[in-house]
């Protein structure tokens, strides 16, 4: 394999897949060495001077003319954003050339990325023109058969043929007008490998797999899923429009119910989605959708990449869930795992690795193909059929199930040959662009992001990367990798460190701000205080770190709150709100943490006697009116509604004007709002001066100390805060905290308040400052609008939902009576 070197003066020839000059199944052509032609007109997709050498498709043009690939690019847009990147020009030239060369080959021999990514319509089991056709890539197999319930597991009459690319196929005519392989019947791929042994495997492209739940450790069986038209779920609702800033609710369907059992897709759709919408999230991120034989892996050891996890239902049930989310105005992201695969042999993709060469396997050979910490297999991203498999996998979930995007898991492991194991990243650019960089994987991600944004321009693609790789979240045509967002993974680590190791008085305001704002310019981040990672057994959620065992005895509103409970609820609200407001360009919360779900997540396993007790969500806690969980939930609902109204996450205006270590106060502006956070354990500041940009009158927009949020009601919501000019006009150094205006506020301990500048026209819309008092609710109402119209921050669909309503929107109520 070719490895990157940042010191090379010219880019070497691309690593081509085995028999690269090849057609896809059913496409005529191919059969020789690749011949690269050169023409005179330069490619316009990449800025700067180019030297012609290799050919790529002119994808921006309507015709199929072949034009030149860049060998060297004098200038890329990413250099304007970060001039330090130009030092690694050789790396980017190499990366771009590899990407364009791969696109060229796919265009030439497969008809382009869009056609290439339709692999799921050619591979696996498909019905075409009165016959069932099955294709499988298994170059190491010497003989192959299709077996299943349809032939009593006897493949003697269903032997398969192999082509020169290692693809086995069989065509079985319909019997009496019906498919020879019935819907919902079990199937397997039987083949003999070089050692002479016959083995049975689940088809790699299978769309459904099940196991016998009555038998301990029973292996999975592949199931042919091809329901008749009357049983297929038909989507009824359009995709919601892409929000300016995603507010993501991370969820696991299986553990989403109250009962100690695996919940279903339909139960989640009917019972949990309305809760998510009521809390004013605009996006749902679903974990563990791809089939995984080990439930406790949280879905990250995938065995069957095209199969819906059967524990929670069928593919049609999952479609119902996604469609229901769309009807509520919720976009749906899928947690996709392309960084590795389960080590399982009998029911996983690893079963196709029978000791052959790396170009004949989905995975690298030897140590390079094994992740020693995850005990899993690592893909060979330079392999032609691996690219087809993974790119088609993305398209399958996006086209067939209407997912609106993906969260790519384990991107750090993909970016580097060392996979980030025992590696601390200091920010030195040589850590990102060196021989350790896995260019094969980067090229795959560039192809994937280009494809997804071409198929669905409004797609949202999120990368889980802890390294801080530069330009990971810049467009491919600028020289980036193409993701829309990366997760701000340092933020939860900071909060956990403080809650475990530091007294409140020793919290550093500047350190908190530095952690929240430490992100690359022009590369968007999703901020979160805690995700599923902080909830698993062995760790604790923020609420449980704050209140611990007192959550068992002190959450009743029928008794006075203890100091621990008061502190816990106050800091729970503050930590999540400052993370949202200052930490990124989007926000994420894991299911249940919005109301401070106690304890931890522990999947059923031998060590807990296969118990589901800690693998569920106790919604009754937040639904019980006399328990204090309702306060944290109400604040979560209100801060999401505040962002919906003011769109501060998508604003480029972010100014931190005060980080007072003595007072334990942080003041900053984000968008049109001024935020004041007082982390001091017991000091109230009266007449505390707060800097701001624009003069005028300010009022409370959101107050964590409001009674409706379990606070003490110390901040007046009917008070107008008038600004005073600061310093000399035009002389910023004479301003207060570098702000030209200021106003004074009351700031109680352990509270956070957001202030907005009064606009009388806007006041009419706010109807009396409902958000400020915490009197904001989401209700279903009849509204008239065209399909897809946004009304007062809420989504309106043309179809009626299950409640008989035509749509929904946020309703701001202004009186105490209205909120009862």
Swiss-Prot record:
Biased composition, class Low complexity, residue ranges: 1-20
Reaction catalyzed: Transfers a segment of a (1->4)-alpha-D-glucan chain to a primary hydroxy group in a similar glucan chain
Enzyme Commission number(s) from the entry: 2.4.1.18
Keyword presence, Transit peptide: yes
CDD domains in the record: AmyAc_bac_euk_BE, E_set_GBE_euk_N
Top class in the EC scheme: transferase
Region spans: Disordered: 1-28
Pfam entry (one): Alpha-amylase_C
Protein purpose: Catalyzes the formation of the alpha-1,6-glucosidic linkages in starch by scission of a 1,4-alpha-linked oligosaccharide from growing alpha-1,4-glucan chains and the subsequent attachment of the oligosaccharide to the alpha-1,6 position.
Name of the protein in its database record: 1,4-alpha-glucan-branching enzyme, chloroplastic/amyloplastic
Gene source species: Oryza sativa subsp. japonica (Rice)
């Amino acid at each position: 394999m070719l490895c990157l070197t940042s010191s090379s003066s010219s880019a070497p020839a691309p690593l081509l897949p085995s028999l690269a000059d090849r057609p896809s199944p059913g496409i005529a052509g191919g059969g020789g060495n690749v011949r690269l032609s050169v023409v005179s007109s330069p490619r316009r997709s990449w800025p700067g001077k180019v030297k012609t050498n290799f050919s790529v498709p002119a994808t921006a043009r309507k015709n199929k003319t072949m034009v030149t690939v860049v060998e060297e690019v004098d200038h890329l847009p990413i250099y304007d954003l970060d001039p330090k990147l130009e030092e690694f020009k050789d790396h980017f030239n190499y990366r771009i050339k590899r990407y364009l060369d791969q696109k060229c080959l796919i265009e030439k021999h497969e008809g382009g990325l869009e056609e290439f990514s339709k692999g799921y319509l050619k591979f696996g089991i498909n019905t075409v023109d009165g016959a069932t056709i099955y294709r499988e890539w298994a170059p190491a197999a010497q003989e192959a058969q299709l077996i299943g319930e349809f032939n009593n597991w006897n493949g003697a009459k269903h032997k398969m043929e192999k082509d020169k690319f290692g693809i086995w196929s069989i065509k079985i005519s319909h019997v009496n007008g019906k498919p020879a392989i019935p819907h919902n019947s079990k199937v397997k791929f039987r083949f003999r490998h070089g050692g002479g042994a016959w083995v049975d495997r689940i088809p790699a492209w299978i769309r459904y797999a099940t196991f016998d739940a009555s038998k301990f450790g029973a292996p999975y069986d592949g199931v042919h899923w091809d329901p008749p038209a009357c049983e297929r779920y038909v989507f009824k609702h359009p995709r919601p429009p892409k929000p300016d800033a995603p507010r993501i609710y991370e969820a696991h369907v299986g553990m989403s119910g109250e009962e100690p059992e695996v919940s279903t897709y339909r139960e989640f759709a009917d019972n949990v989605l309305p809760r998510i919408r009521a809390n004013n999230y605009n996006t749902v991120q679903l974990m563990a959708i791809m089939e995984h034989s080990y439930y406790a892996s949280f879905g990250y050891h995938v065995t069957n990449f095209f199969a819906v996890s059967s524990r929670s239902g069928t593919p049609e049930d999952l479609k119902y869930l996604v469609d229901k989310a769309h009807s509520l105005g919720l976009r749906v992201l899928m947690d996709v795992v392309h960084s590795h695969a389960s080590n399982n042999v009998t029911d996983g993709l690893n079963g196709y690795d029978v000791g052959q060469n790396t170009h004949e396997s989905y995975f690298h050979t030897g140590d390079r193909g094994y992740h020693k910490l995850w005990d899993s297999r690592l893909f060979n991203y330079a392999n032609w059929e691996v690219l087809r498999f993974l790119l088609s996998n993305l398209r399958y979930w996006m086209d067939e199930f209407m997912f609106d995007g993906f969260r790519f898991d384990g991107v750090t492991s993909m970016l580097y040959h060392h996979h980030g194991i025992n590696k601390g990243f200091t920010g030195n650019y040589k850590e990102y662009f060196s021989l350790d960089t896995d260019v094969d994987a980067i090229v795959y991600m560039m192809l994937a992001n280009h494809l997804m944004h071409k198929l669905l321009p409004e797609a949202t693609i999120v990368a889980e990367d802890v390294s801080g790789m530069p330009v990971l979240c810049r467009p491919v045509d600028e020289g980036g990798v193409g993701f829309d967002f990366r997760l701000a993974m340092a933020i939860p680590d900071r909060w956990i460190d403080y809650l475990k190791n530091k007294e409140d008085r020793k919290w550093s305001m500047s350190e908190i701000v530095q952690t929240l704002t430490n992100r690359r310019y022009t590369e968007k981040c999703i901020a979160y205080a805690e995700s599923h990672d902080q909830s698993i057994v062995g760790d604790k959620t923020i609420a449980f770190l704050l209140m611990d065992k007192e959550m068992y005895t002190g959450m009743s509103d029928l008794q006075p709150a203890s100091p621990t409970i008061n502190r816990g609820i106050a800091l729970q609200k503050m930590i999540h709100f400052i993370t949202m407001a200052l930490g990124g360009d989007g926000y994420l919360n894991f299911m249940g943490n919005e109301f401070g779900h106690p304890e931890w997540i522990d999947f059923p396993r031998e060590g807990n006697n296969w118990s589901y007790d800690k693998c569920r969500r106790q919604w009754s806690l937040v639904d019980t009116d006399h328990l204090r969980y309702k306060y944290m939930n109400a604040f979560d609902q209100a801060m999401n509604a505040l962002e919906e109204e003011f769109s501060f996450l998508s604003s480029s205006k972010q100014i931190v004007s005060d980080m007072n270590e003595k007072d334990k106060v942080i003041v900053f502006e984000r968008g049109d709002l001024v935020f004041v956070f007082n982390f001091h354990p017991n000091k109230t500041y009266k007449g505390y001066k707060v800097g701001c940009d624009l003069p005028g009158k300010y009022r409370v927009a959101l107050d964590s100390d409001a009674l409706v949020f379990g606070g003490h009601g110390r901040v007046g919501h009917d008070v107008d805060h008038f600004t005073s000019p600061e310093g000399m006009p035009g002389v910023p150094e004479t301003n207060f905290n570098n702000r030209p205006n200021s106003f004074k506020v009351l700031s109680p301990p352990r509270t956070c308040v957001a202030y907005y500048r009064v606009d009388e026209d806007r006041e009419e819309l706010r109807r009396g400052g409902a958000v400020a008092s915490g009197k904001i609710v989401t209700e279903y109402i009849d509204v008239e609008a065209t399909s897809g119209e946004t009304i007062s921050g809420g989504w309106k669909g043309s179809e009626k939902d299950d409640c008989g309503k035509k749509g929904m929107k946020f309703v701001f109520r202004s009186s105490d009576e209205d909120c009862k």
